[in-house]
Amino acid sequence: MTATLQQRKSANVWEQFCEWITSTNNRLYIGWFGVLMIPTLLAATTCFIIAFIAAPPVDIDGIREPVAGSLIYGNNIISGAVVPSSNAIGLHFYPIWEAASLDEWLYNGGPYQLVIFHFLTGVFCYLGREWELSYRLGMRPWICLAFSAPVAAATAVFLIYPIGQGSFSDGMPLGISGTFNFMIVFQAEHNILMHPFHMLGVAGVFGGSLFSAMHGSLVTSSLVRETTENESQNYGYKFGQEEETYNIVAAHGYFGRLIFQYASFNNSRQLHFFLAAWPVIGIWFTALGVSTMAFNLNGFNFNQSIIDSQGRVINTWADIINRANLGMEVMHERNAHNFPLDLAAGEVAPVAISAPAING
């Protein structure tokens, strides 16, 4: 018996590196998008953690009134945030080397730009990496398409909205209460709750939660029995098994009788496409709505829409919302504005019909 050994062709270092980067046998797939994703997300995460803990107050409004956002300046997990860069910086790109000193960079909120630019680059690459891994494995490319919804939402609040408003100080703060403040001010200035695209987003998120719960409960309730009463029903499934683990006919029959026949899917592929598409399309619309409101194409305004025969206003819920919006608007940036923009931009009201004569 003769044994033959075939020597593998020796590849150069670059080819070995390329093979390792694109290998689907690694525990975690890297990919070419991962080459950029890993350092950018690490930079964003590191800067965020340091800034959240120790960043000095930031002059967010550009009026020399710094706002503290870090833990060591008295905040907690709920109130803390990485404060957006100063209104004095506006839309200027503000890396560390553009500042005269590190203290100036911190005072003007430089860490915020560092975090959001690296974060957005990282999530864009994560989306590309999802497509890349699907391509390597011969899968269809819809996973990255689904992830494009939260990517679009993040891009809208961190990039498109500040561009439309003319300053990164209008971007969403990187913290819990800062996010709520952003939402309240957004409602006050843009009436987002009355925007149809936001309504579609609410339907997408709440509807997606409802459909997910309905699907999960129907599947769990129609599992094919494979275990005894004394065992966990989870032991009835073996990873990779060819048989269906639940009875879709039973689930279809139950739901069709609970609502009506055509409210229930009888095709598993159509069902799962619907479960993916509903929330994704809804969040797409919300991101599109925020991106249009960034340029002040705001929600519907039905203020003082109903009047009686004498011309007197009959208040509706739209007028209640308008009053709430004005209240929220006068509370934010209280030292940067004398009046809310809606009041300051109105026509000048005369305070006297004629000036009195002055006899000296």
Swiss-Prot record:
- Residues the record marks as site: Cleavage: 344-345
The annotation note on the cofactor reads: The D1/D2 heterodimer binds P680, chlorophylls that are the primary electron donor of PSII, and subsequent electron acceptors. It shares a non-heme iron and each subunit binds pheophytin, quinone, additional chlorophylls, carotenoids and lipids. D1 provides most of the ligands for the Mn4-Ca-O5 cluster of the oxygen-evolving complex (OEC). There is also a Cl(-1) ion associated with D1 and D2, which is required for oxygen evolution. The PSII complex binds additional chlorophylls, carotenoids and specific lipids.
Site (Stabilizes free radical intermediate): which residue positions?
190
Q: Where does chlorophyll a PD1 bind?
A: 198
- What's noted about post-translational modification? Tyr-161 forms a radical intermediate that is referred to as redox-active TyrZ, YZ or Y-Z. C-terminally processed by CtpA; processing is essential to allow assembly of the oxygen-evolving complex and thus photosynthetic growth.
Q: Which residues bind [CaMn4O5] cluster?
A: 170, 189, 332-333, 342, 344
Protein's UniProt name: Photosystem II protein D1 2
GO MF terms, alphabetically ordered: chlorophyll binding; electron transporter, transferring electrons within the cyclic electron transport pathway of photosynthesis activity; iron ion binding; oxidoreductase activity, acting on diphenols and related substances as donors, oxygen as acceptor; oxygen evolving activity
Predominantly, its location class is: membrane
Q: Which domain of life is it from?
A: Bacteria
One Gene Ontology cellular component annotation held by this UniProt entry: plasma membrane-derived thylakoid membrane
Q: Could you tell me which InterPro entries the record lists for this protein? A: D1/D2, Photo_II_D1/D2_sf, Photo_RC_L/M, Photo_RC_L/M_CS, PSII_D1
Residues given in the record as pheophytin a binding sites: 126
A GO biological process held by the record: photosynthetic electron transport in photosystem II
Recorded name of the encoding gene? psbA2
Q: Does the keyword Ribonucleoprotein apply?
A: no
Reaction it catalyzes: 2 a plastoquinone + 4 hnu + 2 H2O = 2 a plastoquinol + O2
Gene3D superfamilies xrefs: Photosystem II protein D1-like
Detail which positions bind Fe cation: 215, 272
- Residues binding a quinone are 215, 264-265
